Amino acid sequence: MKASKTHGVIFRDVTRGLWVRCSIPTSAFFLLLPFLAICCIAAELKQKTVDAFDHYVHATDARMGAELRPGSPFLWVDSLPQPHRQRLYDLLQRGQLEIRQEKTEEEAKSIEVPDGLIHHWTGVAFVPGVSLELAQSLLQDYDNHWRTYKPDVRRSKLLEHTDNTFKIYLQFYRDSPRRVSFNTEFEVHYTRIDATHAISRAVSARIAELEHPEQPDSPELPVGQGHGYLWRLSNYWRLEEKDGGVYMQVDSVALSRDVPAIFAWFVNPLIRRVSRQTLAHLLEATRRGVLSAGTGVIASNDFPWQPPLLTARKPQPLLIQSIADDDGRPAE
């Protein structure tokens, strides 16, 4: 097959004062040119966007509170009818991640966020042969999160700890689809429901984009300014010990700048792919870290349960891992 020609595109990143070169297929060049310009225009977080996102998070908290009542399904997999539920449990125990896109509504209506996009995803993984205490201790080992979650977390530090509440610092870093880094602070609260169930809620208190993402000590851009790739983030963990291990579920709710409607048809699938990859990496890194803590053997990045979106390695027999489609069904 003949390779398609590419254009070298040079455009200015106004948030960093740099000129950037990239290559894209000729067929998409003229379609993407306006979007490339928009992506490099600085975005500023507005109060109306913050208020709408806070409203979405409040509604999500209320929904999750109802889901955690005694007798309610603890994991989203438990809400599925049989035999689909048992099939997914079997796949989880074989090493598969189950990931789906979520959406909190009010009175069957979407919660609109002006000038912003909400990225809400839920994922579940199973870690065999470990206890709930071990899984929770890994999540609370914040000084070593840079080891557990590298390269996505470049720096980490526990700032304060009182009872079941932690204040932490994390420096996020990604080099794809474009290089970006953030200094962030979170407040995390843990609740032990009973001997086999625990939950946590992490809410961002501060997110600032770095002016030069390749430099860990780079000056920050003012909070709420920059490219607008990440303005707010909340993560909710649920841990359940059963079936000889621990099921881990994480809900991630993030806020970013919006995408102009004219480009949504092209950009939204890319956003979904990146969001799904990010959550898959979070779950897989957590599982790998818990397994390493439980066995005393450091699991490498060649661990056989790698999500296919994160590696080109051929899956190991009987440990083929897939990511669930948005409707909860495994991808074909």
Regions found by a protein language model. Give the residues of each.
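Bacterial N-terminal signal peptides
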Residues: 23-39
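Eukaryotic helix-grip
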Residues: 43-332
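General secretory precursor processing signal
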Residues: 12, 25, 42-43
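N-terminal secretory signal peptides that target proteins for export/translocation
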Residues: 1-22
